């Protein structure tokens, strides 16, 4: 595995401009809501990207990415849909035409990384999301920005076996299964 030496962006930043001052009662209520609410973001790109955006393609060429577990937890989310797609930029500048192999590589790298982190778990349904919350873990719900299956419908089964339960049919362009326009 070739890990990237490219400096990555910070996962958590303190944005003072959006801080809301709460009194003690409001703070208690807010904390209670955070603890009791199951909060899911179904369209996230939780890959930690380079500090310098011009290094993104170089970063994508590595075979190990950092994932935003810390940011997801800090944001109070129970689970996030991962909207995998970025590795596809290695071979095209039009996201509607990413290669299936690139998409599957990114999903595989993410799932492999999840297995190495005790505080994160792959989730595929509501029961697993609730279990992750009860265990104090962050759930990563593998999704794809679009299917990128071309005319090979059996690839839907491949993605299903990789844990994909939610996918955009197209990105922008027409394909065999939908029209993004």
Label every PLM stretch briefly.
Residues 1-181:
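N-terminal hydrophobic targeting/anchoring segments and the immediately downstream early-domain regions
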């Amino acid at each position: 595995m070739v890990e990237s030496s490219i400096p990555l962006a910070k996962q958590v930043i303190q944005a003072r401009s959006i801080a809301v001052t709460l009194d003690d009662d409001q703070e208690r209520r807010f904390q209670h809501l955070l603890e009791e609410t199951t909060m899911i973001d179904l369209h996230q790109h939780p890959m930690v990207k380079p500090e310098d955006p011009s290094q993104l393609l170089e970063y994508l060429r590595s075979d190990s990415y950092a994932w935003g577990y810390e940011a997801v937890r800090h944001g109070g989310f129970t689970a996030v849909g991962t909207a995998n797609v970025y590795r596809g930029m290695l071979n095209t500048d039009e996201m509607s035409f990413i290669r299936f192999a690139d998409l599957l590589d990114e999903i595989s790298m993410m799932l492999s990384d999840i297995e190495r982190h005790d505080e994160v778990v792959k989730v595929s349904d509501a029961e697993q999301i609730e279990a992750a919350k009860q265990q104090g873990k962050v759930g990563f719900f593998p999704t794809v920005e679009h299917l990128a299956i071309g005319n090979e419908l059996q690839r839907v089964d491949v993605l299903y076996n990789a844990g994909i339960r939610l996918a955009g049919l197209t990105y922008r362009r027409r394909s065999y299964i939908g029209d993004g326009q």
